[in-house]
């Protein structure tokens, strides 16, 4: 051990370039999909970080519609986080197999509250919660001129000439029925009992977002972060009940006894849920987490733009080497890793994927988008959004202190491993994803990679020094017009 203390040399994104290779594939024809686990397939290899200025339900919905995945952060109460997951799962459905419903004796106020909370324009009405026989439907049109919200639903709901369909109705058949009768919601019934619901909005979304990442029921995929704190059991339970597809045990040091024990416990309790564990930076850590039961391991100790772990704690592994080492171990298990942190450009994404990552997790590149929950600020006439690390003092005070194993410390005793700042406002997420995936497609075209598996297996790197990096960026010119995919 003593003799090998300085034996390892490590590389990061700015130390390497991919070598171009003979290609017979055009960028527009490459396959960006990735199978992360038996139940989770993404159509782009991008995951938004579980950070309180990056991902809540709005971001997770937008990410899934683009074909990626969003991780709902845990800097909120258990019920609130579960509610955020529900918003994603109910935002879009092929067929809503478990629709909301109310009974005739409930008040219009309760209907208005339910519809407002989940942003739905109507709700089926059943005789009672046990039998669930459909007796009516309540829509915004029924409520348009209501002034007294204390009246019962039975007094205003539509009861006559209800249009319904059997439970095995396809989306194509449903669309024809909806158009024929000029209605927006089609209850699915069996022997009069409400069994499902198809809406015109969901059909329109299928057409508008054909690349969306969905579960087997046609609902958007969503992930949520948990930790190793006292509320983890109840948090995991509520998230699973809300329909979460992926649980992410999110800590700063995944190669620790507490995390390994938590992986074993969560996987035993919820074997059907895809489980991500991290963060780590070595093959040994990857091996231990996979053997404990993790389906996916998240890689990255300190590479993030808002992370100070490497300078505060003096610990980490430059990210390209960390990805490669962990991927080498993951190959032995036939499992996936996520490259988390350090990505500044689309070129870094393809480097991370070529080094062995199955997907990348992004924070700073997405924090400036409209869908992120960070507050908007105006600074020197330009629009920005607040972005902070989960190891920053503000985030730790709000609840992320357990991520850094400081759960029992008073706020004045926190030792932060991150900073708070601002990032330029970028507009809609879909525009950012378009540019990022355009860069990945271009890189795959240059390397002759038809899909991400081929990129991982066949692409080769060359190392470069500071002069090579300087040569790689625009030089000997003053940039006068900002590019949508480059800022330095």
From Swiss-Prot:
Homotetramer. The keyword Oxidoreductase applies. InterPro entries: Aldolase_TIM, CBS_dom, CBS_dom_sf, IMP_DH, IMP_DH/GMP_Rdtase_CS, IMP_DH_GMPRt. PROSITE patterns: CBS, IMP_DH_GMP_RED. One of its GO terms (biological process) is GTP biosynthetic process. NAD(+) binds at residues 250, 300-302. It is an enzyme of class 1 (oxidoreductase). IMP binds at residues 305, 340-342, 363-364, 387-391, 417. Coiled coil: none annotated. This is Inosine-5'-monophosphate dehydrogenase. Its EC number is 1.1.1.205. Residues 468-488 are annotated as: Disordered. The active site is at 307 (thioimidate intermediate), 403 (proton acceptor). K(+) binds at residues 302, 304, 307, 471-473. Its cofactor is K(+). Residues 475-488 have a biased composition (Polar residues). Pathway: Purine metabolism; XMP biosynthesis via de novo pathway; XMP from IMP: step 1/1. HAMAP family: IMPDH. Residues 95-153, 157-216 form the CBS domain. One of its GO terms (molecular function) is metal ion binding. Catalyzes the conversion of inosine 5'-phosphate (IMP) to xanthosine 5'-phosphate (XMP), the first committed and rate-limiting step in the de novo synthesis of guanine nucleotides, and therefore plays an important role in the regulation of cell growth. Mycophenolic acid (MPA) is a non-competitive inhibitor that prevents formation of the closed enzyme conformation by binding to the same site as the amobile flap. In contrast, mizoribine monophosphate (MZP) is a competitive inhibitor that induces the closed conformation. MPA is a potent inhibitor of mammalian IMPDHs but a poor inhibitor of the bacterial enzymes. MZP is a more potent inhibitor of bacterial IMPDH. Keywords: CBS domain, GMP biosynthesis, Metal-binding, NAD, Oxidoreductase, Potassium, Purine biosynthesis, Repeat. Belongs to the IMPDH/GMPR family. It catalyses: IMP + NAD(+) + H2O = XMP + NADH + H(+).
């Amino acid at each position: 051990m003593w003799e090998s203390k300085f034996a390892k040399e490590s590389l990061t994104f700015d130390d390497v370039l991919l070598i171009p290779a003979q290609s017979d594939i055009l960028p527009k024809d490459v396959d960006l999909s990735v199978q992360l686990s038996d139940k989770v397939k993404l159509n782009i290899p991008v995951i938004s970080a579980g950070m309180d200025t990056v991902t809540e339900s709005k971001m997770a919905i937008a990410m899934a519609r683009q074909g990626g995945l969003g991780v709902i952060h845990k800097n909120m109460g258990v019920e609130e986080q579960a509610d955020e997951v529900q918003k994603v799962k109910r935002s879009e459905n092929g067929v809503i197999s478990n629709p909301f419903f109310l009974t005739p004796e409930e008040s219009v106020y309760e209907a208005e509250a339910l519809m407002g909370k989940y942003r739905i324009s109507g709700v089926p009405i059943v005789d009672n919660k046990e039998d669930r026989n459909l007796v009516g439907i309540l829509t915004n049109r029924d409520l348009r001129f209501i002034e007294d919200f204390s009246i019962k639903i039975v007094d205003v709901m539509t009861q006559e000439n209800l249009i319904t369909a059997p439970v095995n109705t396809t989306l194509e058949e449903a669309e024809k029925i909806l158009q024929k009768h000029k209605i927006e919601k089609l209850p699915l019934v069996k022997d009069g009992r409400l069994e499902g619901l198809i809406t015109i909005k969901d059909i329109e979304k299928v057409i508008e977002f054909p690349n969306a990442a969905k579960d087997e029921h046609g609902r958007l995929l969503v992930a949520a972060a948990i930790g190793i704190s006292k509320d983890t059991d109840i948090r995991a339970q509520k998230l699973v009940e809300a329909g979460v597809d992926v649980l992410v045990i999110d800590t700063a040091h995944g190669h620790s006894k507490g995390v390994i024990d938590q992986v074993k416990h969560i996987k035993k309790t919820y074997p059907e849920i895809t489980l991500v564990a991290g963060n780590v930076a070595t093959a040994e850590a990857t091996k231990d987490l996979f053997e404990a039961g993790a389906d996916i391991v998240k890689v990255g100790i300190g590479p993030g733009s808002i992370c100070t772990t490497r300078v505060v704690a003096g610990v980490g592994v430059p990210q390209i080497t960390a990805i490669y080492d962990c991927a080498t171990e993951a190959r032995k298990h036939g499992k996936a890793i996520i490259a988390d942190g350090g990505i500044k450009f689309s070129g870094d994404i393809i480097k991370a994927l070529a080094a062995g990552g199955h997907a990348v997790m992004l924070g700073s590149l997405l924090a400036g988008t409209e869908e992120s929950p960070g507050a908007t600020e105006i600074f020197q006439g330009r629009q920005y959004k607040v972005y902070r690390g989960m190891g920053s003092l503000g985030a730790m005070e709000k609840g992320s202190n357990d991520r850094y194993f400081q759960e029992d410390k008073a706020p004045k005793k926190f030792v932060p491993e991150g900073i708070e700042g601002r990032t330029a406002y970028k507009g809609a997420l879909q525009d950012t994803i378009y540019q990022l995936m355009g860069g990945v497609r271009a890189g795959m075209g240059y390397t002759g990679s038809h899909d991400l598996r081929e990129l991982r297996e066949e692409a080769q790197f060359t190392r470069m020094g500071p002069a090579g990096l300087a040569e790689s960026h625009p030089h000997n010119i003053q940039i006068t017009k900002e590019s949508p995919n480059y800022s330095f």
